[in-house]
Amino acid sequence: MALTTTVPDICAPRSHAAKRVSILEAATNVFCREGYAGANIDMIAAEAGVSRQTVYNHHVDKEQLFVAVVLALTERANSGFFETLATFPDHPENIEEDLVAFAIRLNRNCICSGDGKFLRKLIQTEGERYPELFAGWREHGPGKTWTALAARFGRLAHAGHLDMDDPDVAARQFLALINADLHVSMMLGDQPDDERVRQAATNAVRTFLRAYGKRDSR
């Protein structure tokens, strides 16, 4: 096992809030790189450029810091999703083209974002260790996004642009489809380029519209 050392605060003076952000960012990197079991406070302090005691001044122990990381990532991921959702095509001129453009934005801003990748990795590696924490994440992360997206699809259906009985199911399927072509490669550490993101969005929307497009447009 590599030796770790406690370091003094080596950066220029920072506010309490700035140090808290630095610690959370460092902890995110260390937990994703080392896993929960392999991470320790000294590693996180060194990466944040603060002392070990400074980390403890903000978080009482490693477990509490891990919980804070998951909550912060969930909050940021949700913020990115809802900013992107504000661009949803409520009044589409061309339903396929407009949904493809929206799906590209979702892929870039959410699924392929750093926060999205970190969350997926932590869930995959540490979900069994903290079932209650990740149950809360499902409720306040995907649960909220599915509901919000379902409402938008419901409006499109009501306006006659789509044909669906259950917008909740449609929203989950839409998100699964736009993620499908990228998921495995991102799990292996690849970062999809713009062309792959565009193609994944196009494939997803065409499949989605075969199920939910108006019959005269299928």
Can you describe what each PLM-predicted range is?
Residues 1-18, 81, 85, 216-218:
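N-terminal intrinsically disordered/low-complexity leader segments
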Residues 11, 135, 143, 157-206, ...:
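Hydrophobic/aromatic-rich alpha-helical bundle segments in the mid-to-C-terminal region
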Residues 22, 26, 30-64, 68-72:
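Helix-turn-helix
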Residues 60-64, 68, 90, 111-114, ...:
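Residues in soluble alpha-helical coiled-coils and helical-bundle/repeat scaffolds
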Residues 73-80, 113, 130, 148, ...:
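A short secondary-structure junction motif
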Residues 82-119, 170-174:
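Hydrophobic alpha-helical connector segments
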Residues 112, 117-124, 128-158, 199:
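Amphipathic alpha-helical packing segments from all-alpha helical-bundle domains
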